[in-house]
Amino acid sequence: MENSSLMKVAVYSTHKFEKEYLEKAFSGKHDVKYISSPLTLETASLADGNEAVSIFVSDNASAPVLQILSKIGVKFLVLRSAGYNHVDLAEAKKLNIKVARVPEYSPYAVAEHTVALMLALIEN
């Protein structure tokens, strides 16, 4: 959907299993660019023209990457994870990039995943 009034968001490390849910959540609210590659020094420029970037826990949000994002106009960094140790928060603050994350995971989802892993181990 191309609408100049919608915030443009680049979503890095997009997995097939989450794209359906992201599309539902963003529908009519944001102009989304899905990028299957992780955020790195080499891929940061793919976010050019986007005001926000969404990343996963394995993406690189170090100071050099954040500097590139800032230079191309990124103002928001949204984490699709509770952990944020891969983000240079001091640099983000210095560059005036707002950072948001998932506050916590559902304890039910964690328990279900644990049981699924145990069943997979038993099967093998």
Each model region followed by its residue ranges:
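N-terminal glycine-/charge-rich "phosphate-binding" loop or analogous flexible N-terminal tail
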Residues: 1-50
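Phosphate/diphosphate ligand-binding glycine-rich loop within oxidoreductases
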Residues: 51-124
